[in-house]
C-alpha cells in the first residue's frame, strides 16, 4: 500500500512525542499505574522492538509503545492507530504480533493519547491502553480473515481501529480514558465486563 501522507517528518513527529513525554511524565504514570517512567526514545529498543519507554510498577518493568496524536486529527480521536502497512518492515503490526513470540522483545502495552497539543498538553484528550498480547490475537484473526487491509487509511499511512471496536472485540486488557487539563476524569475497562 502506498503512503499518501503529505509533508510528514519523522523527526518532527519524534520531537512532538518527546515533548509530550518530558512534560507529562506524571500523566503517563497515572495512565499506567506506575511509580516511574523511563523514556527509551531513539534507543535500539524503540527502533527495533517498538518499546518507547518502560513503566516501573513496584518490581515489574513494563514495556510501552507510546502513540501521541495532535488535535488536528479530531476526526480520528476515537481511533487507535498502528502505523505503516503490514508489508513494510517498519510496520507497527509486526511489533504487536511479536508479543505472541517468547523469543523476542516487544511492548507489553500500547498507550495512545489523542488530542495532545504542540506543547505536550492535554486540554481535552482521549486515551486507550491495550495489553499487547491480547490485541495481537485480535490482529492475527484479522490477518487470517484477510480483513486487516480494510482498516488501512493510505492518507494517514496507518491502520485505524475504532476504540469501541477494540474495546468490545477483546475480552480483557483494554482501558479507556478521558483526560481534561492533563488529569484523568473518566475511565472504563473491558476487564469490568
Residue ranges and their predicted role:
Residues 58, 105-106, 131:
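Short, solvent-exposed coil/turn segments at beta-strand boundaries
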Residues 54, 111-113, 128:
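Conserved hydrophobic/aromatic positions in well-ordered beta-strands
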Residues 53-74:
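Conserved catalytic cores of phosphodiester-cleaving nucleases, focusing on short active-site segments
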Residues 6-11, 67-123:
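Catalytic cores of nucleic-acid endonucleases
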Residues 115-193:
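Non-catalytic C-terminal interaction segments of nucleic acid-processing enzymes
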Residues 1-47:
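Acidic-basic catalytic patches of nuclease active cores, encompassing PD-(D/E)XK
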Residues 42-58:
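Charged, well-structured alpha/beta interaction segments
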Residues 34-35, 51, 107:
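Short, well-ordered alpha-helix to beta-strand connector turns
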Amino acid at each position: 500500500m502506498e503512503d499518501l501522507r503529505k509533508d510528514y517528518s519523522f523527526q518532527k513527529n519524534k520531537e512532538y512525542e518527546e515533548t509530550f513525554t518530558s512534560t507529562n511524565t506524571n500523566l503517563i504514570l497515572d495512565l499506567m499505574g506506575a511509580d516511574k517512567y523511563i523514556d527509551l526514545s531513539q534507543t535500539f529498543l524503540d527502533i527495533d522492538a517498538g518499546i518507547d519507554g518502560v513503566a516501573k510498577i513496584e518490581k515489574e518493568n513494563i514495556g510501552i509503545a507510546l502513540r501521541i496524536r495532535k488535535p488536528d486529527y479530531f476526526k480520528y480521536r476515537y481511533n487507535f492507530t498502528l502505523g505503516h502497512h503490514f508489508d513494510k518492515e517498519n510496520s507497527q503490526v509486526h511489533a504487536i504480533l511479536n508479543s505472541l513470540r517468547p523469543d523476542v522483545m516487544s511492548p507489553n502495552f500500547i498507550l495512545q493519547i489523542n488530542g495532545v497539543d504542540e506543547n505536550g498538553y492535554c486540554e481535552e484528550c482521549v486515551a486507550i491502553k491495550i495489553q499487547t498480547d491480547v490485541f495481537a490475537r485480535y490482529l492475527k484473526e484479522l490477518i487470517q480473515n484477510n480483513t486487516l487491509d480494510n482498516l488501512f487509511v493510505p492518507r494517514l499511512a496507518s491502520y485505524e481501529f475504532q476504540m469501541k471496536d477494540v474495546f468490545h472485540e477483546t475480552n480483557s486488557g483494554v482501558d479507556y480514558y478521558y483526560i481534561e487539563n492533563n488529569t484523568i476524569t473518566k475511565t472504563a475497562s473491558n476487564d469490568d465486563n
